C-alpha cells in the first residue's frame, strides 16, 4: 500500500550526469525510470519536474555575461531536454508518459494546464512538467512547488544526492547532523538551503509537505512510498 496517492517528484538535473561532467548518463536515467516504474505499479499518481543544471543553469549563465532572461530561457529548454530523455526511458520501461511544457512548443510537448495534468495522472500516465514556470527569475524548485500545489499533490518528494537535510553541508562539515523531520519555520529561521526562499514559502503557505531523500540510491523511492523512515520530512 502506497503512503501517498499523488506525488510531485522533483529530480535534480545535475544528478542525471551520474559520473559524467555534463549531459545525461544513460545508466542514471535508466535507474530513475525503473524506480519510477516501481511506484507507478503501486498505483501512485506521479507528476515530475526535472531541473536543467546538467546542461545549463540560467543564474550561472548570467554570471558569465549572459542576459539573465535569455539565460533562464536557455535553462528552461534544458529542462525540456531532460524531460524528453526521462519520457523516453520510461517508455522503454513500458510506462506511459505525457510531457507538458510551460511554454508552447508543440509537437515536443503539450502546453501545460492543471486539468490536463490531473486527467493524465488519473488515467495512469506519468506526467512530466517541463520548462519551469515559463517565466525567468524562477528556479525549478519554485516551478516544482507551484506544480505540486496546482496538481493537489499529497507531498513533494525532492530527490537529491544527499540523504536528507542536515544542520550544515555534510560534504563540507563532518559534524553536521541529519534531521528526521523539521518544520518550515525552522528551515527558514536556520537559513537551511532546502530550496530557494520563494519555493519554501510557497510550500509552507499551502501546507505541502516535502520529503528530501537520496534518489541516487536505487530502491529509495519505493522505500519512501512504502513508509520507511528515510530522508527528512519538512512539514508545516
Spans of model-derived segments:
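C-terminal catalytic "cap/lid" subdomain
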Residues: 1-236
Amino acid at each position: 500500500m502506497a503512503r501517498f496517492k499523488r506525488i510531485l517528484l522533483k529530480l535534480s538535473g545535475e544528478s542525471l550526469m551520474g559520473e559524467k561532467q555534463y549531459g545525461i548518463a544513460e545508466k542514471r536515467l535508466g535507474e530513475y525510470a525503473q524506480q519510477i516504474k516501481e511506484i507507478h505499479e503501486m498505483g501512485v499518481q506521479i507528476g515530475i519536474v526535472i531541473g536543467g543544471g546538467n546542461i545549463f543553469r540560467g543564474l550561472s549563465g548570467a554570471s558569465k555575461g549572459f542576459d539573465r532572461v535569455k539565460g533562464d530561457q536557455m535553462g528552461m529548454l534544458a529542462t525540456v531536454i531532460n524531460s524528453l530523455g526521462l519520457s523516453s526511458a520510461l517508455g522503454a520501461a513500458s510506462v506511459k508518459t505525457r510531457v507538458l511544457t510551460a511554454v508552447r512548443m508543440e509537437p515536443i510537448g503539450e502546453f501545460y494546464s492543471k486539468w490536463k495534468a490531473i486527467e493524465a495522472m488519473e488515467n495512469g500516465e506519468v506526467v512530466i512538467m517541463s520548462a519551469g514556470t515559463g517565466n525567468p527569475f524562477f528556479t525549478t524548485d519554485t516551478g516544482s512547488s507551484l506544480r505540486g500545489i496546482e496538481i493537489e499533490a499529497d507531498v513533494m518528494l525532492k530527490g537529491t544526492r544527499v540523504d536528507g537535510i542536515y544542520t550544515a553541508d555534510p560534504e563540507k562539515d563532518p559534524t553536521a547532523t541529519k534531521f528526521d523531520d523539521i518544520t518550515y519555520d525552522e528551515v527558514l529561521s536556520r537559513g537551511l538551503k532546502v530550496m530557494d526562499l520563494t519555493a519554501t514559502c510557497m510550500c509552507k503557505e499551502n501546507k505541502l509537505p516535502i520529503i528530501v531523500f537520496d534518489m541516487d540510491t536505487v530502491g529509495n523511492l519505493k522505500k519512501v512510498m512504502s513508509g520507511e523512515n528515510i530522508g527528512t520530512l519538512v512539514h508545516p
